[in-house]
Amino acid sequence: MINEQIELFKATIKGKKIAVLGLGISNLPAIKFLHKFGAVITARDRTPYDELDNDKLEVVKAYCMDFVLGDGYLDNLDGYDIIVKSPGIPPYAGQIESAVKNGAHLTSEMEIFMTLCPCKIVGVTGSDGKTTTTTVIYEMLKAEGKKVYVGGNIGSPLLDKVEQMNENDWVVLELSSFQLQTMKISPDIAVITNLSPNHLDYHKGGMAEYINAKTNIFNYQNENGKLVINADNDVTSSFEGKQKGNLIFFTRRDYNKDIACSQIKDGKIYCCGEYIMDVSDIRIKGMHNAENYLAAIAAVYGIVDPENMRNVARTFGGVRHRMQYVRTVDGIEFYNDSIGSSPSRTIAGLVAHGGKIVLIAGGYDKKIPFDTLGEAVNRYVSVIVLCGNTSDKIEKAVKDADKDKKDIPIIKTDDFESAVKTAFAAAKGIDADGERVSVILSPACASFDMFKNFEQRGDKFIEIVNSL
């Protein structure tokens, strides 16, 4: 079957001057895709020529008419028909705004993909729980016998696969505020897990800008769309009435409001009044994971049979870097929760875990407050080991929240490996008193001060733990 959107795209893109900003994982296949349809491409990236990876350099030389590398890569953007921006580059950086005012169309690899995609799309966003919810939705659709692609912040880029997709397939996307901020298209089914302060270093308009970016996941839906939002979160619940299509809430409470919902009642999960599963069926523990399932169930309700939902819940063991058990050394359990890049995500993990905890935290400063983390550390943590740019801020938050004068040991280290080894030594000195003792890497911060991403940070943690 001919994809009419792709045929139209081919006709309009040929000969267009396109600046591709950022040579990240998604834009490299985008360059090849655009080149195939006759676009005239200039690649632009902050990395200097002599530091650019060989694979990126090969793509630039083979598919681009020109390239601009180094500090001035966002200068002189006038004259382009289209600017394809990498998610990590703010839309007001450099001369992007000026180019748009002068007629350039600002878009992204993800927006191009969603425009051309012939099949139904489920999009998931939120401050926490995105990846697990996205993966559970993917697994449930797959269990129903659907052909499913997963992408966005997880998986691999999908633009170069769009020509092989058809209207009977499904796509599940994890979408960040970075991706959504400039997007003018929404998925068929939009899920917002929760919203709390995050990425305020990126969003110069603060929390309001962050929230506005997130709402683009449903702003462009039509009356056939579905919006799934968290009724227990003050921000997301305020979106009620702003949707154009169908609304379904999810909540851990017994919800009496006359709106369709996925909810927990007496340890059982119901959706729109129908029994789906027991909470105890969910293999990955913690109420935050139960919430992820509530969101996923609401998204696929009416598409996936409840028995297939239950089978996924009973067999799915979680996602790498999300409270991932690594090993036990000298009676100390080690858990990799490197995805814990915000206080709320780290707190959820601490609440669910139990036992005596030595927490490794700290990292890149996203300009978000740590007061709630300080309270949680005083309640759930035996020792906290800090490293990274935010060490002093987290230390202050923990001390300020210590109303009961517990004086929880706070140990600051100079590097990541020292932090892991220090945490191990601290854990061995804890009186277990019959409880399990765990070292948990859940930094409550991004990794950019020491690592490329949270995956690299988690992999390094596993490497160090396996060497103990």
Short names for language-model regions:
Residues 57-61, 371-437:
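C-terminal helical cap/extension that packs against the catalytic core
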Residues 32, 36, 74-80, 87-231, ...:
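Phosphate-binding loop of NTP-binding sites
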Residues 43-45, 192-194, 230, 439-444:
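Short beta-strands and strand-loop turn motifs
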Residues 40-45, 150, 172, 249, ...:
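Short beta-strand "acidic-cap" motif of Rossmann-like dinucleotide-binding folds
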Residues 2-17, 27-37, 147, 277-382:
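Nucleotide phosphate-binding/pyrophosphate-handling subdomain across enzymes
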Residues 46, 70-71, 107-111, 244-264, ...:
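Beta-strand->loop->alpha-helix junctions that form or flank phosphate-binding loops
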Residues 40-48, 227-231, 360-361, 380-389:
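Short internal beta-strands
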